[in-house]
Design a protein with these regions (language model features):
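N-terminal secretory signal peptides
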Residues: 1-30
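N-terminal export signals
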Residues: 19, 28-53
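N-terminal cap/lid segment of alpha/beta-hydrolase-fold proteins
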Residues: 58-95
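Short beta-strand element of the alpha/beta-hydrolase
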Residues: 98-107
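Cap/lid segment of the alpha/beta-hydrolase catalytic domain
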Residues: 109, 135-158, 266-271
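Alpha/beta-hydrolase active-site loop
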Residues: 150-174
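Primarily recognizes the serine-hydrolase "nucleophile elbow" in alpha/beta-hydrolase
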Residues: 166-223
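Short beta-strand/loop motif that positions the catalytic acidic residue
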Residues: 228-230
C-alpha cells in the first residue's frame, strides 16, 4: 500500500484539473499537459496523477467479515430500465425485526470497493443498505475506476434513472426493511438523489453529497426532507446550488445545507488524497442522525 497523501500535498490547481479529468471535462492528455505546467514537467505530472488514483485498501472501515453485519450480492428486476440489475446488500446481523433501508448510489464509475464499504457502514449503523451497480448491463464494475468511468459514460442516463428507481422499490418492498427508505449518493450519485427526491413521493429522506442540482421545475414535487452536503472548494457543483436553495425555500421544502469549508469535491471518499477525514466523519455522523430521525419510528 502506498503512503497516504492529503489534499494539502497538491496545489489546488492540480486538484481542479483532476476533478475535470475524472468527470470527463478533460482527457488524460489534457490533465497531464495542465499538470506539467503546474509542477514543472511531464514526469512529475505523471507521478502526480498516479498519486491521485484511488487506493482501495484504505476504504475498509467496516470489513466484509465484520460480525455486526451480513452481506451478499443480490439481483432484482428493473422492468423499465435494464431488465435485471445487481447490487451489494448488507444487513445488521441477527436483526429480529425489519430495519429502515438506505440506498447507496455510487459515483460515475460503478460499484467500487469504496461504495461497498459505505454500504457496510450503514448496515453497521443498523440500516439495511443496498448499493446497486449501474454498470450491470455492461458486466459490472470492471475493477478499476478509469474503465468504470468509460463504461458508465456509455449508458443512457434515462435508462440508468429507471434502474435507480427499481433499486429503491426493491429495497422498499424487501422483507428485511420497514418500507421506509432513504437515499445517499456521492458525486453523480448525489445528483441522482436529488432527482429521486423529485421523482419519488415515498422517498423517506435524501442525503446528496456534492451532486448536481435537479431541474428547478421539479422542486415542487419534492416531499422527502433533504440534507445537502457540499465541499467548500467545489466551485463546479456549488455554482448550481444558490438557485436550487432558493427554489426549495420558495416551495416550503424541508432541507438543510452543510458546507465543509476547505474540503474538495469527493471529500467523503477515503481512497484518494481529496479525502478530508474531519469533514467526512462529521458528514457521515450527520447523515446517520438524519436518517435515524426521518426513517425510524
Amino acid at each position: 500500500m502506498s503512503e497516504r497523501r492529503k489534499a494539502g500535498d497538491f496545489p489546488q490547481e492540480i486538484l481542479k484539473l483532476f476533478d475535470g479529468y475524472v468527470h470527463g471535462f478533460i482527457n488524460r492528455r489534457d490533465f497531464l499537459e495542465g499538470a506539467a505546467r503546474v509542477v514543472g514537467g511531464g514526469v512529475a505530472a505523471l507521478a502526480v496523477l498516479e498519486a491521485l488514483e484511488p487506493e482501495y485498501a484504505w476504504a475498509e472501515q467496516v470489513p466484509a467479515d465484520d460480525t455486526r453485519i451480513r452481506q451478499e450480492y443480490v439481483t432484482y428486476p428493473s422492468p423499465d430500465g435494464s431488465g435485471t440489475m445487481r447490487g451489494y446488500m448488507a444487513v445488521p446481523q441477527g436483526a429480529s425485526e425489519p430495519k429502515p433501508g438506505v440506498l447507496v448510489i455510487h459515483e460515475n464509475r460503478g460499484l467500487n470497493p469504496y461504495i461497498e464499504d459505505v454500504v457496510r457502514r450503514f448496515a453497521a449503523a443498523d440500516f439495511v443498505a443496498l448499493g446497486p451497480d449501474a454498470l450491470t448491463p455492461l458486466g459490472g464494475y470492471p475493477g478499476n475506476d478509469d474503465e468504470g468511468r468509460e463504461l458508465q459514460g456509455r449508458l443512457d442516463r434515462d435508462v440508468m434513472m429507471e434502474d435507480w428507481v427499481a433499486a429503491f422499490r426493491f429495497l422498499r418492498d424487501h422483507d428485511a426493511t420497514t418500507g421506509r427508505v432513504g437515499a445517499v449518493g456521492f458525486c453523480y450519485g448525489g445528483g441522482v438523489v436529488n432527482q429521486l427526491a423529485v421523482r419519488l413521493p415515498d422517498l423517506g429522506a435524501g442525503a446528496p453529497f456534492y451532486g448536481s442540482a435537479p431541474s428547478l421545475d421539479g422542486v415542487p414535487s419534492i416531499r422527502a426532507p433533504l440534507m445537502i452536503q457540499l465541499a467548500g472548494l467545489d466551485e463546479r457543483v456549488n455554482a448550481g446550488y444558490p438557485e436550487y436553495r432558493e427554489a426549495l425555500e420558495a416551495n416550503g421544502k424541508a432541507f438543510t445545507v452543510h458546507v465543509y469549508e476547505g474540503a474538495n469535491h469527493g471529500f467523503h471518499n477515503d481512497t484518494t488524497p481529496r479525502y478530508d477525514e474531519d469533514a467526512a466523519r462529521l458528514a457521515q455522523e450527520r447523515t446517520i442522525a438524519f436518517f435515524n430521525e426521518h426513517l425510524r419510528g
